[in-house]
Amino acid sequence: MNSFMSLVRTATIALLLIAFLQNANAVKNLQSIVAYHGAVATDDGRCSAIGTNVLRQGGNAIDASVAAALCLGVVSPASSGIGGGAFTMIKLANGTEVAYDSRETAPLSATEDMYGDNPERKKKGSLSVGVPGEVAGLYTAWTQHGKLPWKQLVEPAEKLAAEGFKISKYLYMQMNATRSDILADKGLSELFVSNGELKKPGAICRNPKLADTLSQIAEYGPKAFYNGTVGFNLVSDIQKAGGIITLKDLQNYNVKVKEPLSTEILGYRLLGMPPPSSGGPAMMLILNILAQYGIPSGVSGPLGVHRLVEALKHAFAVRMNLGDPDFVPEVTNVVADMLSPKFAQDLKSKINDEKTFDPKYYGGKWGQIKDHGTSHLSIIDSERNAVSMTSTINGYFGAIMLSPSTGIVLNNEMDDFSIPTKSGGDPDVPPPAPANFIRPGKRPLSSMTPTIVLKDGKVKAALGASGGMYIIAGTTQVYLNHFFLNMDPLSSVVAPRIYHQLIPNKASYENWTTVYSDHFEIPEEIRLVLEKKGQVLTPIAGGTISQLIVEQSDGKSGGISKLVAVSDPRKGGFPSGY
């Protein structure tokens, strides 16, 4: 039993849950670090180190985010990569605040009824692939705000793909969960299978085709991907497999540069991602509801958890009115409501401290989309520029399809769209949301919630999480733990979490032992109180993986603030800094 296990064994109730920190010092060497010049928190320590190396070389947070994100796509290809997309939130020391939407788009030939009577084709295979945006997004942010040469930022990932990387325990778990699909795909089999069996943790994995692709991108930038050899080969592979993406789809792809959502809550200003992210507005709505109870007492203990669950249910009722604002103009009004303190006040008045209600009480008209996967990174540099980026290919290994000629694992982002269903279904299941129906060039709704926290205009934190539909609740709880409940950064991330998506009407709570032998569980005393209030609870083995960096003033360092960076132990990652 390692020291982290003993840490997790003794739990004390805070809001969410637990602080689990009896023996934190032994863990802090890995999961939590203190740095003064710059810090990088990703869900894989190799990529955190690559990001820090970029900072040491004179790069800024934007440079480091490019190198770290590309690294994650190589060593953690079940979660993200250049075959997917991303949302990136940036706050610069000069005052600039900007959001980059490089979410995947529906192909130009896509239609809302393209899956007919076979919705499984929306989940995996060539028809589930959206037009990738990550390369364009990274390059656009770097062009506008980066310092180091582009090629220098791509080379570490290229080297990893060429020379090989060790399969982590977490990646092996993802491989095992999709074993039959990997064995059925030629490209994935070449990467992850040896002698008819999945490669084991610690085995070396090489992706020479991806190394070649990254070499092209390093030399020619996104042109290679969107209008060059890489793009031509990628489209050819997709079409051979029956997909509809064309070179014109790639050529037409564009990054949306947006103004972040912004709201003041209890003295802090939050920057969040606007739609097609539902995460930014939903997190702000939840926090605005909970802030009215008073902190920390109003959001502490079992009652605080009940109030959180109820706020989540209200937020998810509103969430499915959101969609791509370029196609659904009324989304702007929905977001205005979600950021309104008066709207939050009205919802808070509907929360009953003694009981919960069925989904209809919360007013949700539409069914929920269950997005998956993702990877999150947080970076703050010596100038206190901050980047919070969540990237994704959606489900484990996306479309379960690796392009043989490029080495790219392709996303299954089309599964994040809603599709019409025939009438006559379960009367308790709401219909799919028209705001999220497929249209050519449209971006599907997402739960990704990259967040930056400011105080008096200065960066105080960068945070976010991976975990698909659970991301909103997971990111919100980490924020609550630190900023509402005054838990230290490591405790804020380690505390077990609870989730609710309104439909089904169940609260999912962590009760699992990770592949690293760490156990996470909502305490029984909290569960008993919730059940007495009518909450239906179900245990889950998983949830969200959070990366948090907090800026703290430190009287011992001559006025230089320190950075406390935490990578979630649930995925075995660790932060890096100097």
UniProtKB/Swiss-Prot annotation:
Segment forming the signal sequence: 1-26
GO CC annotation, single: plasma membrane
Active site: T374 (nucleophile)
GO biological process, one term: glutathione catabolic process
EC number: 3.4.19.13, 2.3.2.2
Entry protein name: Glutathione hydrolase 2
Localization annotation: Secreted, Extracellular space, Apoplast
Glycosylation sites: N94, N176, N227, N511
Pfam entry (one): G_glu_transpept
This protein's UniProt keywords: Acyltransferase, Apoplast, Glycoprotein, Hydrolase, Secreted, Signal, Transferase
Biological role stated in the UniProt entry: May be required for glutathione transport into developing seeds.
GO molecular function: glutathione gamma-glutamylcysteinyltransferase activity; glutathione hydrolase activity; leukotriene C4 gamma-glutamyl transferase activity
Main location: secreted
InterPro entries: GGT_lsub_C (IPR043138), GGT_peptidase (IPR000101), GGT_ssub (IPR043137), Ntn_hydrolases_N (IPR029055)
Residues given in the record as L-glutamate binding sites: R103, T392, N394, E413, D416, S446, S447, G467, G468
Tissue expression per record: Expressed in roots, immature trichomes and pollen. In developing siliques, specifically expressed in the embryo, endosperm, outer integument and a small portion of the funiculus.
UniProt similarity note: Belongs to the gamma-glutamyltransferase family.
Induction field: By glutathione.
Keyword Cell division applies: no
Pathway: Sulfur metabolism; glutathione metabolism
Catalytic activity: an N-terminal (5-L-glutamyl)-[peptide] + an alpha-amino acid = 5-L-glutamyl amino acid + an N-terminal L-alpha-aminoacyl-[peptide]; glutathione + H2O = L-cysteinylglycine + L-glutamate; an S-substituted glutathione + H2O = an S-substituted L-cysteinylglycine + L-glutamate
Disruption phenotype: No visible phenotype under normal growth conditions.
